[in-house]
Amino acid sequence: MCKKFVYGVAVSDYNFIGRERETKRLLDNFKGGINVILMSPRRLGKTSLVKHVCNKLDDKDIITVYLDIFGCKSEYDFYNKLTAEVLKQTASKSELWFEEAKEFLYRLTPKISFSPEPNSDFSISLGITPKTHTPEEVLQMAETIAIKRKKRIVICIDEFQQIGEMANSKQIQARLRTVWQHQKHVSYCLFGSKHHLMSTIFLHRSMPFFQFGDTISLNKIATEDWVKYIVSHFADGKRTISHALAEEICKFTENYSAYVQQLAWLVFTLKEEGETVTENDVKQAKNDLLATNDILFMQMIEPLSEFQLNFLRAIIAGVTKDFGLSE
């Protein structure tokens, strides 16, 4: 049974909405070997879009590789993650990926770490260090695999802003760009959740990744698309919501994809099959949404000084000028 609304994770198929133009543009770039930089504020569905495009890509001569580097804190953390995912996701048979890895990268000493949490996946470190492998050797591996397999590879790197937060970030970026820009059989889709850091990496002329590829700015999904989606998904769940109340969900969440899905779900759970959503239901769900996010909001403002908080209060109150003037 399909979930009617999904948030907090990447969505696909039934829960994926809109993005026809962006999907076509990404597909064309992937097929054409064009590098892509995907930028937007948080919670607009970048990861969902990229995974959606990877699933739609029907070219047997193209292999897509997806990796999330949020946990990478150093240059060689990134190299280990990149290498492991490229090797695993391009292997001819998944169970043979490590045996095949020896063909493309020597001196590997894998270490497997298990999480203490039940049902958690394990992580693999290939033992890549400055003493065992140069950056160029690691970064060129995907190109070597592509040539050997007679395929093209598209590597999609989520949370790419982590590169910008590493020590010696600009030098790392320069090393990546120097190798990647000369590859003929591998292209890259780079995206992340911190818009200001992504802008610094890709939009500043002084940075190595300036004009690295097709920069796509992801905008919010239109209200009319959301309303159709919400109304139809309520109907699929044998519940009824008016266009006006569906539009109110969009207005309250300002069309941020994750929050639209979350608020719609909270409203959905208030009704049983055969029932119709009321204004009071939407009002209650709004309060539930705010309460759910209270802890997150508190964590965000805890580090702020009283002066900074007063500054924010002034903006909320509509003050837009004369900041800093004494009476």
Model-found features: residue ranges?
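P-loop NTPase nucleotide-binding core
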Residues: 34-35, 39-44, 48-155
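Amphipathic alpha-helical "lid/sensor" segments that cap RecA-like P-loop NTPase cores
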Residues: 227-295
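Conserved AAA+ ATPase "SRH/arginine-finger" region at the nucleotide-binding site
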Residues: 214-225
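Conserved Walker B catalytic segment
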Residues: 125-194, 203
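Short regulatory helix/loop adjacent to the ATP-binding pocket of P-loop NTPases
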Residues: 195-213
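Hydrophobic residues on short alpha-helical segments
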Residues: 27, 308-316
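A short, basic N-terminal segment
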Residues: 1-36, 41, 111
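Short acidic, hydrophobic short linear motifs in intrinsically disordered regions
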Residues: 320-327
